[in-house]
């Protein structure tokens, strides 16, 4: 009997190992390569050959079947960074870049260090109390796994749509969309004096939630939190706005988690959906929610964003998490194509950055989501840094007698922000050299986080190459990057591995990147509202910060500066100064930049060739796998969308664009806006030749009489 048990034990061990090995091999064989995926690992031989010994392994212990729960996309994991991308830094090093300062900078740096010693001591005093946890940035510690074969086409379409929408947003923004002070005053009621809430205990929150709030270092509710949390806990619809960095994310997550503490434990269902305009903001919101509810039993979060693994998201949504944080496109995809995902029991709908959600790029998706969501009674909350008061937009969102909350007057920058302006005049060609000069001047050791905003993705990429060739560590963040590249850029920026981040307005909305010391506006934004969002990345949560803006000679640039100064005068806080620049030094640096033009072109060409080689390898491997698993791939149901390609293009084309593009030519934003203005204006009557000659004939007839 004893011998029989021993043999059975050994055979069971061998069988279990063979089964696991076979399943792993089958999983590898079932994998179809995509452009954004890793290369397949080669099989190193059958693992069962190692188990052919007849001896019993004394260290073998039976364990329970492990189920890996989703714990966030942790970019710090080593096994995530296997994605093949073009090594741009390697190309720059081969061209002599990223090696330090250019010739002649060493001596000047010593002088600058002596001048900046006093400033460094002041900064140490300011930063002494900044040991707080980087809460929201942990949301970027999210590992991005590669997409499988089914989602490749959808992901490419999402990336193209996002890149197009980013370009469209740069073109479509006009000052006519801004509300006047009278319209805002009419929309929001006059403020009434209420009791000031001095602690989260006064909000009557549950103990598990209070423990999570305390662990995050929250002690006193911010103004938006104190105003909105009690109303949200009453179940009323909310339209709320506050300045950036005021804690809007926690303002809606805290009442939601408090509500879910009392949910029916027997039934698992998705009860809350949080919509965000960008993937990065969705990842951040999901991570903040997990930390707030870490001590709440049976509280689950789901993430549904484009660019990340579709199959993993489907498996996660299959468990019906309580709160799903999503971007509009991927949410519609899951509702239509994931049979196990249901929103029948939805109770709360949140739209973060609501004004941007209502812009043209998200209008169609929002309408479709509102049609897909059940019509039963639900709570809807809109949170944003700015709140557009267009009545038709609020009606479309189907709000039921919403409570309107506006904390802090709109169009105000942080009180501890120093706004500096550099007048470019007719020196547009010197801007790259000026940027390098200022970066070396304000942070010679590259120990502070600096965000540089540009208007175009192409300029962001070119500046990264230029500054890299001049010896600076720089990363980029914009819509043309893959999701893995975006997350890696922010992770490097967070850890100060790369202290300078060049980005478009993609990162200007909602993202809480902590401890950013300086914001530089390389290109002036389109409106004062976008300017506030950009400079709002620094001087957050009561810290000091500085913004440096390059101002051109256009009327638009000047009006934004006037609005910023006017806002400071009304606010009676903050500071605005004109920064003097040593233009002779900038011109010397520009001559160095000009001398590297051929090198820049070589880097761009080499990068393009490397990308083509990588894509060819991926396509070759993908074709090979498709031939092996053709039947299985074609047997899977095709994913559907609520719009055809023709309907998408038609929805994006406004009547003005249709009239301007009759012959298939693309029109830039200036021509389109000029056409709109001409169409809106009443046509003035212009005298014809006969009209001008009529008075003369009348005068002659009078003389004859």
Swiss-Prot record:
SMART domains, per database record: DEXDc, HELICc
Motif (Q motif): 198-226
Protein name as catalogued: ATP-dependent RNA helicase DRS1
Keyword Protease: no
Catalytic activity: ATP + H2O = ADP + phosphate + H(+)
SUPFAM superfamilies: P-loop containing nucleoside triphosphate hydrolases
Keywords: ATP-binding, Coiled coil, Helicase, Hydrolase, Nucleotide-binding, Nucleus, Ribosome biogenesis, RNA-binding
Binding sites annotated in the UniProt record for ATP: 242-249
Annotated region described as Disordered, given as residue ranges: 36-56, 90-178, 631-705
Listed Basic and acidic residues bias regions: 674-694
């Amino acid at each position: 009997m004893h011998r029989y048990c021993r043999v059975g034990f050994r055979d069971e061990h061998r069988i279990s190992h063979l089964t696991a090995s076979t399943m792993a091999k089958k999983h590898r064989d079932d994998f179809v390569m995509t452009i954004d995926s890793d290369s397949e690992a080669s099989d190193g031989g059958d693992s069962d050959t190692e188990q052919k010994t007849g001896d019993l392994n004394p260290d073998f212990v039976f364990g329970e079947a492990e189920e890996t729960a989703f714990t966030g996309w942790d970019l710090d994991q080593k096994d995530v960074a296997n994605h093949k991308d073009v090594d741009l830094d390697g190309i720059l090093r081969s061209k002599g870049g990223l090696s330090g300062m250019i010739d002649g900078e060493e001596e000047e740096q010593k002088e600058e260090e002596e001048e900046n010693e006093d400033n460094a001591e002041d900064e140490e005093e300011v930063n002494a109390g900044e040991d707080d946890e980087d809460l929201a940035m942990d949301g970027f510690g999210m590992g991005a796994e590669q997409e499988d074969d089914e989602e490749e086409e959808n992901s490419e379409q999402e990336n193209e749509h996002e890149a197009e929408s980013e370009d469209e947003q740069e073109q479509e923004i006009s000052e006519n969309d801004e509300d006047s002070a009278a319209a805002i005053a009419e929309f929001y009621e006059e403020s009434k004096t209420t009791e000031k809430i001095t602690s989260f205990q006064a909000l009557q929150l549950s103990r598990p939630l209070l423990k999570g709030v305390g662990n995050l270092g929250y002690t006193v509710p911010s103004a938006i939190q104190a105003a909105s949390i009690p109303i949200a806990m009453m179940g009323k619809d909310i339209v709320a706005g506050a300045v950036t960095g005021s804690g809007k994310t926690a303002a809606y997550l805290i009442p939601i988690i408090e509500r879910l503490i009392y949910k029916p434990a027997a039934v698992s269902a998705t009860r809350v959906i949080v919509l965000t305009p960008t993937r990065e903001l969705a990842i951040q919101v999901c991570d903040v929610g997990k930390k707030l509810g870490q001590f709440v039993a049976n509280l689950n979060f789901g993430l549904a964003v484009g660019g990340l693994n579709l199959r993993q998201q489907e498996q996660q949504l299959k468990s019906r998490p309580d709160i799903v944080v999503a971007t509009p496109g991927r949410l519609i995809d899951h509702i239509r194509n994931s049979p196990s995902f249901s929103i029948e029991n939805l109770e709360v709908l949140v739209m973060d950055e609501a004004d941007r959600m209502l812009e043209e790029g998200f209008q169609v998706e929002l309408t479709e989501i509102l049609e897909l969501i059940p019509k039963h009674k639900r709570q809807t909350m809109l949170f944003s840094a700015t709140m557009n008061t267009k009545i038709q937009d609020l009606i479309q969102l189907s709000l039921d007698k919403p409570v309107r909350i506006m904390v802090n007057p709109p169009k105000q920058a942080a009180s501890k922000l120093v706004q500096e302006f550099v007048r470019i005049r007719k020196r547009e060609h010197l801007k790259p050299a000026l940027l390098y000069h200022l970066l070396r001047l304000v942070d010679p050791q590259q120990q502070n986080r600096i965000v540089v905003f540009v208007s175009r993705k192409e300029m962001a990429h070119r500046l990264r190459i230029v500054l890299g060739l001049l010896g600076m560590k720089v990363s980029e963040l914009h819509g043309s990057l893959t999701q893995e590249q975006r997350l890696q850029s922010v992770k490097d920026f967070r850890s100060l591995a790369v202290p300078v981040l060049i980005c478009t307005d993609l990162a200007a909305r909602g993202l809480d990147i902590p401890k950013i010391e300086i914001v530089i506006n390389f290109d002036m934004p389109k409106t004062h509202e976008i300017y506030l969002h950009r400079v709002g990345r620094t001087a957050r949560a009561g810290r000091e910060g500085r913004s440096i803006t390059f101002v051109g000679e256009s009327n638009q640039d000047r009006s934004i500066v006037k609005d910023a100064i006017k806002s400071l005068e009304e606010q009676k806080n903050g500071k605005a100064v004109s920064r003097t620049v040593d233009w002779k030094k900038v011109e010397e640096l520009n001559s160095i930049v000009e001398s590297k033009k051929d090198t820049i072109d070589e880097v761009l060409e080499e990068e393009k060739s490397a990308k083509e080689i990588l894509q060819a390898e991926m396509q070759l491997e993908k074709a090979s796998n498709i031939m092996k698993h053709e039947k299985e791939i074609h047997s899977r149901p095709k994913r559907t969308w609520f719009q055809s390609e023709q309907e998408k293009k038609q929805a994006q084309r406004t009547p003005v664009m249709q009239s301007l593009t009759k012959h298939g030519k693309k029109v830039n934003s200036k021509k389109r806006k000029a056409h709109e203005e001409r169409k809106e204006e009443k046509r003035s009557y212009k005298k014809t030749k006969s009209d001008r000659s009529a008075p003369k004939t009348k005068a002659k007839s009078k003389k004859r009489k």
